[in-house]
């Protein structure tokens, strides 16, 4: 469950290392974002010569959460940390590689590119 002020790791090679959620998109008073939800983030930590710079406001999709996601069979998939993938204005990933596992819940029409780049799909 990601909310405003939540810090997330970046799971791609866009150049950002840590981002902070500044808005959960999808409703006027929506408080929490889960896996597969789109959020507005600001870059808090970035590497030199990356595609994004510190202080930039970006759109991102949540790919891993500590809270996890419940499957229809009753199992819960949880991760050790919260992570997101940065998106451009066309909702496509900025980076060309994805680090770490992602869940099957991202297998929608919008995020198939992220699933195909990921090394492992749970």
From Swiss-Prot:
Transmembrane segments: none annotated. One of its GO terms (molecular function) is structural constituent of ribosome. GO terms for cellular component: cytosolic large ribosomal subunit. Keywords: Ribonucleoprotein, Ribosomal protein, RNA-binding, rRNA-binding. InterPro entries: Ribosomal_uL14, Ribosomal_uL14_bac-type, Ribosomal_uL14_CS, Ribosomal_uL14_sf. Gene3D superfamilies: Ribosomal protein L14. PROSITE patterns: RIBOSOMAL_L14. SUPFAM superfamilies: Ribosomal protein L14 (SSF50193). It holds the Pfam family Ribosomal_L14. GO terms for biological process: translation. Belongs to the universal ribosomal protein uL14 family. NCBIfam families: rplN_bact. Part of the 50S ribosomal subunit. Forms a cluster with proteins L3 and L19. In the 70S ribosome, L14 and L19 interact and together make contacts with the 16S rRNA in bridges B5 and B8. Binds to 23S rRNA. Forms part of two intersubunit bridges in the 70S ribosome. HAMAP family: Ribosomal_uL14 (MF_01367). This is Large ribosomal subunit protein uL14. The gene is rplN.
């Amino acid at each position: 469950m990601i909310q405003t002020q939540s810090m997330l790791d970046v799971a791609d090679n866009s150049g950002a290392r840590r981002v902070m959620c500044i808005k959960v998109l999808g409703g006027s008073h929506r408080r929490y974002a889960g896996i597969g939800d789109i959020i507005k983030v600001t870059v808090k930590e970035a590497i030199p010569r990356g595609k994004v710079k510190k202080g930039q406001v970006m759109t991102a999709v949540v790919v891993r959460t500590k809270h996890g996601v419940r499957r229809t069979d009753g199992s819960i998939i949880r991760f050790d940390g919260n992570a997101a993938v940065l998106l451009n204005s066309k909702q496509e990933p900025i980076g060309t590689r994805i680090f770490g596992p992602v869940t099957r819940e991202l297998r929608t029409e919008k995020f198939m590119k992220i699933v195909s780049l990921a090394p492992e799909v749970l």
